[in-house]
Amino acid sequence: MKPSIRIMLAATALVAAPPLLAHGVAAGALAIGHPWSRETAPGQKAGGGFLTITNKGKTEDRLLSATSPAAADVQIHMMKVEDGVMRMRQVTGGLAIPAGGTLELKPGGYHIMFMGLKKPFKQGDMIPATLVFARQGKVAVRFKVQPIASTAPMEGGHGGH
């Protein structure tokens, strides 16, 4: 291969690399960004899933539910302090994603709960899941498993910051 062709191919790869590193999904008016989870310990039966959902449309949508072949059940949960104690509860009726707004599912707040894990989540794994929306319908995503101490998505090797 000629050097000029190699340089052109390398430059094209560098330009294309950032979108590949920042994994996410576009589905109609919804942009689902950085789905991630934490590594789980052997024998641990549950794990959390986190992401952002931006609604670029003019109509509200709702995240109704989720499924995954990696878990017996997947639920939408919220965490909040009640009487000085942090409690986790299942959300019924889904979560609104307002027109022009963003819903953030993050540690300590709303999140996806993978229950009855079929095997431990290991760092580097990509956990397949399907999110179900009121308007958009079913959307396939993959949660990138990060180290157990992560507090935010790691993209492109920049750590949990």
Question: Could you describe each region identified by the protein language model?
Answer:
Residues M1-L9:
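Bacterial N-terminal signal peptides that target proteins for export
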Residues A16-A17:
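N-terminal signal peptide c-region/cleavage motif recognized by signal peptidases
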Residues H23-M126, T130-H161:
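Compact, glycine-rich, soluble single-domain proteins
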